[in-house]
A protein has these predicted regions:
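Metallo-beta-lactamase
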Residues: 22-26, 30-31, 61-62, 69-70, 119-158, 160-227, ...
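Active-site metal-binding motif and surrounding structural segment of the metallo-beta-lactamase
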Residues: 59-61, 72-116
Length: 242
């Protein structure tokens, strides 16, 4: 009887664990060292689509790159980071004007988090009456927070006219956002604001400037491959042939 009861309880635990995993709306994965990718989800063209953001834990606090796409996860992300690292988010930088990057800017400003976008992104958000950051920066800027330094780099138009990437030159970590397509991607995705003529040139500029990245974090889908820049160029070539 005891064995049957134990088996039953184990079965319940497995089912509960599976349900939590399949219903998970926020996922945090370790990249390396103090770097983490967080993933939220939304529906796109009738299918569930992941959106990747990143954060780095510094001596002074946590720096967040982009905000959750799922608006219900603004606070859970802050809570999860604090529980895991015992540090608060102090800076948030959005990499372009679409809602999967900027949706949480107004929310995070209320908590005293310093929010940043480029001036171009700010102008687009203002014109569209969408959330704006507290501060604007030049497209190519250098930040030092705690023990980490990183660059915001505008290589040119692509997914949007304002998309920037984040480059950690010492750690060789490239946060590409939606400008760089995952190796899982079979097409270029949302082209509403895209410039497909400039996009390949932009990617090549990134390859020349951000050399030999150890990690490339894409805006959506799988981010674990270092071949995503080449894959983006391949998708652009295929698009031109249509």
């Amino acid at each position: 009887m005891r064995n049957i009861t134990l088996f039953f309880l184990l079965g319940i635990c497995c089912i509960t664990s599976f349900a939590q995993e399949t219903n998970q709306r926020l996922k945090i994965s370790h990249v390396c060292g103090d770097f983490y990718v967080y993933i939220t989800y939304q529906s796109y063209n009738g299918q569930k689509m992941s959106a990747n953001g990143m954060y780095v834990v510094t001596n002074e606090g946590v720096v967040l790159f982009d905000t959750p796409w799922d608006t219900t996860q603004f606070q859970p992300l802050l809570d999860s980071i604090y529980v895991r690292h015992h540090k608060k988010v102090i800076v948030c930088i959005a990499t372009h004007s679409h809602e999967d990057r900027t949706a949480g800017l107004s929310y995070y400003k209320k908590f005293g988090i310093k929010t940043y976008t480029t001036k171009q992104t700010d102008e687009i958000c203002k014109d569209r009456n969408e959330p704006q950051a507290q501060y604007t920066i030049d497209k190519d800027s250098v930040f030092t927070v705690g023990q980490y330094s990183f660059q915001t780099y505008y290589a040119g138009a692509g997914h949007t006219p304002d998309n920037i990437v984040i480059w950690f030159p010492k750690e060789k970590i490239l946060y590409g956002g939606c400008l760089i397509k995952s190796i899982e991607a079979t097409d270029l995705g949302n082209l509403t604001d895209a410039n497909v003529e400039a996009w390949p040139i932009t990617i090549k500029h990134i390859q020349q400037t951000c050399k030999n990245p150890r990690y490339i974090i894409t805006g959506h889908q799988d981010w674990t491959s270092t071949k995503s820049l080449e894959h983006t160029l391949k998708l652009l070539e295929e698009y031109k042939k249509k």
